[in-house]
Amino acid sequence: SRRQRQMCIRDRNAEFLVAVPTDITDVEKRAFFELFYKSKFRPKNVMLCEKPLADAVGLGIDVNQPTGVMVVDMGADTIEISVISLGGLVLSDLMHFGSNRLDESIISYIRREFNLVIGKKTAKALKEELGSGLPGRQETMTVVGLDVVSGLPVEREITAEVVYEAIKANLESICSSIKLILEKTPPELARDIIYAGIYITGGGSKIKDLDQLFTQITNIKVNTCENPEESAVRGLSKIATDSKYKRIPFSMKNTTLK
């Protein structure tokens, strides 16, 4: 998927740097390696980097420091909650759903509550325009869908409250995972996180008031960023060019090729 193929190329036919999810097996990592190593570009090597580290570097964080950092990466297909320190991962939880699941929840909810069938593009537009981490927003949006009973296209006004109710259960699952990771975090690193705040990134983090929701459930401030969907790519670029991050990428060349 797209989240697993974010990539920075130092030089054509030279070396690839690929961000991979943390919660995958060595077999899956080898599959990633071979996918790029045997591609038409024929690089001399493929270096892998755990995606939370790329995200953090892309956010401007020096991951080599002994301080603890929490990053919540809300991608299209997965959500990864990680605690980072000393250039590595201390804790990580990969949730096997992402912002695309929110679109599906909106489609299901509107069909169930209004007998209206909408498409994925409409659901995504509703999420982006009306989606919120907290209830109480007053915005509305007019959509066109198919009436389940008549089969004919109809217009209907959808409120922000409807969208909130549709995605509420998904948001609660994310909140539960964040709290679980915080409970497992060593006290010294937890202190750092309380001081610096939680960082959220990925395209799904652009949902309105999501930072306020996470602050409410953790009592910790939440940091957002511009163009959050590009943070991993920015991080890979820095890792590829800054020698202080040279220990972060790893290769499976010797363990894969016969």
Residue ranges and their predicted role:
Residues 76-78:
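Short acidic, Gly/Ser-rich segments with clustered Asp/Glu that frequently serve as metal-coordination loops
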